[in-house]
Amino acid sequence: ITATGSAGGNIVNVTINGKFEITNVKLDPICVDPRDVQMLQDLIIAAHHDAMSKIQDELKTKYGSMLGGMGIPNL
């Protein structure tokens, strides 16, 4: 399972796998401003959160009924 999350109108993309490990980061050069590093950091975090949400939704869809009664958080 993999999912790609985006932020900033798709200028930052983060891909993660089913273990929530980041496997790829794509940055549009427009978002790389040495005077505003904080914005880039925030966009990367937002894209990662978006990807995690997509993975969690996919896991719920595929395994939610099977694991629902086990009390696993966020599932």
Walk through the language-model features, giving the residues of each:
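Amphipathic, positively biased hydrophobic alpha-helical segments used for protein targeting
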Residues: I16-F20, C31, E58, K62
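A short interface-forming secondary-structure element
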Residues: V25-V37
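Stable alpha-helical structural segments in soluble proteins, enriched in small hydrophobic residues
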Residues: L43, A47-I55
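Long amphipathic alpha-helical segments used for membrane anchoring, targeting, substrate engagement
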Residues: I1-T4, K54-L75
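N-terminal intrinsically disordered, cationic/polar leader segments
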Residues: T4-K26
